[in-house]
From Swiss-Prot:
Annotated spans, Hypervariable stalk region: 36-88
Subunit structure: Homotetramer.
GN (gene name): NA
Name of the protein this chain belongs to: Neuraminidase
UniProt-annotated stretches for the region Involved in apical transport and lipid raft association: 11-33
Alphabetized GO MF terms: exo-alpha-sialidase activity; metal ion binding
Amino acid sequence: MNPNQKIITIGSVSLTIATICFLMQIAILVTTVTLHFKQYECDSPANNQVMPCEPIIIERNITEIVYLTNTTIEKEICPKLVEYRNWSKPQCKITGFAPFSKDNSIRLSAGGDIWVTREPYVSCDPGRCYQFALGQGTTLDNKHSNDTIHDRTPHRTLLMNELGVPFHLGTRQVCIAWSSSSCHDGKAWLHVCVTGYDKNATASFIYDGRLVDSIGSWSKNILRTQESECVCINGTCTVVMTDGSASERADTKVLFIEEGKIVHISPLSGSAQHVEECSCYPRYPGVRCVCRDNWKGSNRPVVDINVKDYSIASSYVCSGLVGDTPRKNDRYSSSYCRNPNNEKGNHGVKGWAFDDGNDVWMGRTISDESRSGYETFKVIGGWSTPNSKLQINRQVIVDSDNRSGYSGIFSVEGKSCINRCFYVELIRGREQETRVWWTSNSIVVFCGTSGTYGTGSWPDGADINLMPI
């Protein structure tokens, strides 16, 4: 082979090898692109809302004859569908309640800028829980806190923080309100915010941070709502609202709301005589509320809401150990499921109860005359048997020497069941504690447990003598 032939042969072999290497690199590139765009793709309906993807870095070391290729690609997790909550899981079986959260707002107010509040409550989105309260437009160590015992002023706003975070100066003011309710439908928050003159108030419906609808007072006598969470099932949220006398017959309606828009209004029906400040919970496929009768009964009204056909039924908790304050001594109190018991019915306090088969779990003040102490227990047959009084699993939440206040329920969806939780408002200041001029609160929160538990007392704990006047 002459020199020219050798050169041509070597050149041909080199060109062939180079071509093979080039084709291999193209194959590697095609494989990488295919993995990125096809291996991890997810099909989802076009009309479903999706959550932002979280990036994950995957490294692949591919060794070939000629090159070592270190390829880094960024992969998107398949989009997580955001769906309406349907609350179809069963209720958790519990033995009692365990401590969950306490915000210590009053104690912290002795040395920090903490809002003056009342009417607190708790509600959760699918990921975490939040505490709400109606602020008085002032911090505690501020002369504007004088005379904040009054319920309805134009300065009151709905405050919202992550559960356990006191209402500090950086707290978000969600809306203007002296009465409110909030709930999350699985996609966004709904806030119902009532404000204005007593004789012509307005309820604003704020969904996903935007005002969507409103309704004016229909009886011109302090339009008001739950002061605890509303409930949304398959995109329809229900809220109970009352307008009218606090000590005689009033006009109660249930509003059905979809993404902030009122789609239906149903009047109260059934045997309940007076309904205010309902504590509501999902009872699939409907919503159940236990409320306050401020006119005739110290037994609590029950309102059952059918989300599908907008029908309403009402009655009273059957337990003869009644839940309102003031009330008769347990030896003399009564309830027969259908009607108010006409026992110290005038006045009352927001509270809660929930059914557990034929039984009922409930919370109430320990004192039968004042908002002092707090206890929970289960009444066997208390949901279905008239005047049932067999009490078990009693727990003291706040001892009888300390003040309590409003209380209410909220629900938390777990992997296999829906847990019931409650909060207790711990009121401090006026009227009882006249050394100071303000009225405010902290909260303590418990949740249902299937485990064992101990004993204790969880009062507000602030020394009034150390507090700003």
